[in-house]
């Protein structure tokens, strides 16, 4: 998703959205079999509720199932056996999203020195996994050097997050198509350009380089049209951002979200689909096809709109 200057100011109260995420694959020859798996169902949490969800696949799959992974993400599997040249996957959701708790960014751990957010003891044991580097490694000397100006000793955690998001937003250019899902953080550092996935992964590497537990979050961001303009259907996109684990009292924890693509902290405009250690844990779609096709085209459209109903209709 691109950085968008038309984002509205944070809203008050719970908001209901309808999300339509459509992916179409077109092939130059017949595909005889398609296996797919995707993370397309919004999560349920204390501040988010998936009111309704429908996944439509055309041609209809001969086999499909739904499961939940170790991080609590909902995964959808399908196998299409009908010969086809076009495969369309449409995910429709109705989601309620509430604002962050009062004080999440203005009191408690957010105002404590960032060093205090490093996982420790039993409360932090489940978060330790999110402090670890990836394979191949992404925490390099270049990442540590880039992170250093934000992580001043004893600086309040929320100031670190705001500063890191702001620096990435300022130092890097959003350029669609400039990277792929296999582009590493250090390549992005050198090129100084990328997309939301790259900026989220850079922020995560910086946080982990300093011992904090950070996760990759995939989902959607509700945006407003420019003043005086009608909302255009399908212009939104999947989005990605970072979250850092913080210990709360007593024996609780919270994830504080930062969005370096748009230079802001996460609020009720953000709809969470998946959480993981990296993009590879929660890709919207991936799969295997059997075909002699030499070429393929993929079209993706996403629409996130305020909604007042409580049911999905055709």
UniProtKB/Swiss-Prot annotation:
Coiled coil: none annotated. Keywords: Acetylation. One of its GO terms (cellular component) is plasma membrane. The keyword Acetylation applies. It holds the Pfam family Bact_transglu_N. The modification N-acetylserine is found at residue 2. The keyword Acetylation applies. SMART domains: TGc (SM00460). To M.leprae ML0607. This is Uncharacterized protein Rv2569c. It comes from Mycobacterium tuberculosis (strain ATCC 25618 / H37Rv).
């Amino acid at each position: 998703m691109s950085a968008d200057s038309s984002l509205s100011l944070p809203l008050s109260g719970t908001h209901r959205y309808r999300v339509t995420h459509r992916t179409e694959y077109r092939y130059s020859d017949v595909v005889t079999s398609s296996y797919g798996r995707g993370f397309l169902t919004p999560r349920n949490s204390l501040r988010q509720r998936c009111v309704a969800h429908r996944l439509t696949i055309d041609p209809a799959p001969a086999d499909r199932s739904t499961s939940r992974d170790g991080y609590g993400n909902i995964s959808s599997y399908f196998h299409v056996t009908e010969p086809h040249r076009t495969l369309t996957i449409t995910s429709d959701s109705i989601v309620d999203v509430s604002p962050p708790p009062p004080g999440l960014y203005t009191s408690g751990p957010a105002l404590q020195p960032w060093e205090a957010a490093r996982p420790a003891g039993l409360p932090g044991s489940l978060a330790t996994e999110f402090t670890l580097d990836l394979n191949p490694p992404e925490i390099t000397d270049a990442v540590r050097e880039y992170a250093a100006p934000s992580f001043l000793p004893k600086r309040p955690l929320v100031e670190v997050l705001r500063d890191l998001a702001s620096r990435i937003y300022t130092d890097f250019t959003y350029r669609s198509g400039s990277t792929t899902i296999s582009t590493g953080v250090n390549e992005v550092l050198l090129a100084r350009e990328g997309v939301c996935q790259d900026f989220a992964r850079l922020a995560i590497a910086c946080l982990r380089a300093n011992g904090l537990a950070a996760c990759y979050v995939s989902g959607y961001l509700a945006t407003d049209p420019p003043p005086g303009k009608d909302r255009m259907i399908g212009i939104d996109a999947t989005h990605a951002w970072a979250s850092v684990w913080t210990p709360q009292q007593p024996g609780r924890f919270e994830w504080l979200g930062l969005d370096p693509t748009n230079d802001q902290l996460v609020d009720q405009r953000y709809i969470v689909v998946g959480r993981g250690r990296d993009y590879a844990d929660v890709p919207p779609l991936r799969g295997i096809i059997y075909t002699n096709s030499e070429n393929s085209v993929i079209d993706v459209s996403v629409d996130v709109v305020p909604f007042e109903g409580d049911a999905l209709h055709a």
